[in-house]
From Swiss-Prot:
It comes from Zea mays. Involved in the degradation of the storage protein zein. May play a role in proteolysis during emergencies. Its main location: other. The active site is at C167, H307, N327. The gene is CCP2. Residues 20-142 form a propeptide. It is an enzyme of class 3 (hydrolase). One of its GO terms (biological process) is positive regulation of apoptotic signaling pathway. Expressed at the onset of germination. Its EC number is 3.4.22.-. It is found in: Vacuole. It holds the Pfam family Inhibitor_I29. This is Cysteine proteinase 2. Belongs to the peptidase C1 family. Disulfide bonds join C164-C207, C198-C240, C298-C348.
């Protein structure tokens, strides 16, 4: 049995290093000696539980980098097993020469069941998009060959939903923040927590999921959405604390893309502004690193989609057309918080539940 003292030390070490998760092994980091000592202590703990192997060392460095905390030898073994399975998935997938690559990230020691329960929403029927109301532009209005709304300066920074299935709120605020900045030329950060706490009457369920189309309707009839500063994110369901004097944006209406109509979605993303979309996340996607994601195993129906995000552009990479999408799992996930999804096949239902707001 491994002495409890070592695991207590590991918890303390990890707590101290959580604030420097992105600088763990950078040569330019001025506090590298502290990080190195923390890594050394955790490595000793992991080796005591797992033995001195290359994979155990890799696991210890992963834990330090992402500020992990393991409270017992049993948990170290459990997380190491999941981490090893993730590592094998990354290696086997990347050997296939697909259009995308996986990589180890902060989710590598979480089981699929844990990840699904804390990062994804429950499937909901996107009935609003059965018949869309987006008006396609005239044929004389040419779509740009590629589009990236970040280059126009209207896309807000990537946020992190944490351990709450509130992706729909971040998709909603991302679309609203872009629309507001496009209209005013000023940046804004809006309250996801208000949507978590206050949107239940419009068939949204806080940390258990919701839909941007329903969130836009809530904001429209509520009279607005507060700013992030006045109503900060907590990542748990709470009591509604909306205050009219703190409203940052109002919604006049929302526009829905017809279910599965990628031509409408491309028209909206190319010529209007970023669009809230949803798709089905399946197990390997959580380890996405780069490239154009594609899958033969995800669904495309309204009851398949389980994660809401924001389409901010499109393009072509190595001959594969893609959607450029902003996620809400932090800027250290994927390609600086973004990913690319294959276009033209309604991949994983990306055009199944899409809508965008019209702001006051």
């Amino acid at each position: 049995m491994v002495p409890r003292r070592l695991f207590v030390l590991a918890v303390v070490v990890l707590a101290d290093t959580a604030a420097v998760v992105n600088s763990g092994f950078a040569d330019s980091n001025p506090i590298r000696p502290v990080t190195d000592r923390a890594a050394s202590a955790l490595e000793s703990t992991v080796f005591a539980a797992l033995g001195r192997t290359r994979d155990a060392l890799r696991f210890a460095r992963f834990a330090v980098r992402y500020g992990k905390s393991y409270e017992s030898a049993a948990e170290v073994h459990k997380r190491f097993r999941i981490f090893s399975e993730s590592l094998q998935l990354v290696r086997s997938t990347n050997r296939k020469g697909l259009s995308y690559r996986l990589g180890i990230n902060r989710f590598a020691d979480m089981s699929w069941e844990e990840f699904r329960a804390t990062r994804l929403g429950a499937a909901q029927n996107c009935s609003a998009t059965l018949t869309g109301n987006h008006r396609m532009r005239a044929a004389a209005v040419a779509l740009p060959e590629t589009k990236d709304w970040r280059e126009d300066g209207i896309v807000s920074p990537v946020k992190n939903q944490g351990h709450c299935g509130s992706c729909w709120t971040f998709s909603t605020t991302g679309a609203l923040e872009a629309a507001y900045t496009q209209a005013t030329g000023k940046p804004i950060s809006l309250s996801e927590q208000q949507l978590v706490d206050c949107g239940f009457a419009f068939n949204n369920f806080g940390c258990n999921g919701g839909l941007p189309s329903q969130a836009f309707e809530y904001i429209k009839y509520n009279g607005g959405l507060d700013t992030e500063e006045s109503y900060p994110y907590q990542g748990v369901n709470g009591i509604c604390k909306f205050k009219n004097e703190n409203v940052g944006v109002k919604v006049l209406d929302s526009v829905n893309i017809t279910l599965g109509a990628e031509d409408e979605l491309k028209d909206a993303v190319g010529l209007v502004r970023p669009v809230s979309v949803a798709f089905e996340v399946i197990t390997g996607f959580r380890l996405y690193k780069s490239g154009v994601y594609t899958s033969d195993h995800c669904g495309t129906t309204p009851m398949d989609v389980n994660h809401a995000v924001l389409a901010v552009g499109y393009g072509v990479e190595d001959g594969v057309p893609y959607w450029l999408i902003k996620n809400s799992w932090g800027a250290d996930w994927g390609d600086e918080g973004y990913f690319k999804m294959e276009m033209g096949k309604n991949m994983c239902g990306v055009a199944t539940c899409a809508s965008y707001p019209i702001v006051a």
